[in-house]
Design a protein with these regions (language model features):
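Extended, charged catalytic domains and RNA/DNA-binding interfaces, predominantly
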Residues: 1-255
Length: 255
């Protein structure tokens, strides 16, 4: 049937698609950050089509337990994780559901896990009643997420591997990690030489975690941006967003 109408492959067309803009990785004061959570949702609703306001949830391999100089740093992080588990997560899920309005403004449940070995990741959930899944590592997290509608996405990938930068040896190609976060207020992880250098407080960029390094290894993935800002203002100017081409602003179409 080659050359006939019946034999033509039907390709997706942009003629019936629209651009929708969101921020799927940003923070407020529900864990460590600034700005009220409701104000964050209101800010998102005023300028975005969809959002996930992201609590920090865990750091399984947090270092420094044997160094008394770092106790205040550990307490700062673990104290926030404790608050999230003592009612904070339920409040967060409830407010996410409150702001989710099909066809008007979509809200997604997500949360972040830090990792020295694997790099920091965000779990973005399709389900509005998604539980907070405990893990012993990012790889454990990915195993537990199998069979569920969850995207597990690495970010600020260009920091040094072993110090919360990305480790491409652990990349899982497929539906679980269909894209990676290349740009945020941390800077640009396309390479270690380009524009938008990384923030000084977590170190300079390193080639081994960058997008170009992953592509040279033959990895297949999409690219997204997020603000990763910590002041309760999703979609803040210049910090990164994600654009989606979809037929309509519904959960299924955006996902």
């Amino acid at each position: 049937q080659r050359g006939t109408a019946a034999g033509k492959k039907i390709m997706p067309s942009a003629s019936n698609l629209k651009y929708f803009w969101g921020d799927l990785h940003n923070h407020c004061n529900i864990t460590y950050g600034h700005g009220d959570m409701r104000s964050a949702f209101e800010a998102a609703k005023g300028q975005l089509d969809f959002v996930s306001v992201t609590p920090h949830a865990m750091w399984p391999d947090i270092p420094g337990a044997d160094d008394p100089r770092l106790k205040w740093v550990i307490d700062y992080h673990t104290g926030a994780f404790k608050r999230l588990r003592e009612g904070g997560y339920e409040k967060y899920v409830a407010m996410t559901n409150e702001y989710n309005k099909e066809g008007e403004f979509l809200a997604f449940v997500g949360y972040e896990a830090h990792s020295m070995e694997h790099g920091d990741h965000v779990a973005l959930n399709y389900d509005l009643d998604a539980p907070l899944v405990e893990c012993t590592s990012i790889e454990d997290w990915k195993q537990k997420a199998r069979g569920h509608k969850v995207f597990i996405t690495p970010h600020h990938m260009g920091y040094q591997t072993g110090y919360r930068g990305y480790n491409w040896n652990f990349f899982t190609e497929g539906d679980q990690t269909p894209f990676v976060e290349m740009y945020s207020r941390h800077g640009l992880a396309e390479s270690d030489q380009g524009d938008y250098n990384y923030l000084h407080d977590m170190g300079p960029r390193q080639w081994e975690g960058t997008i170009q390094c992953g592509l040279e290894q033959g990895k297949k993935f999409g690219i997204m941006g997020s603000t990763d800002q910590h002041a309760g203002y999703p979609g803040s100017y210049g910090d990164g967003r994600i654009g989606v081409l979809a037929e309509s602003l519904t959960r299924d179409k955006i996902w």
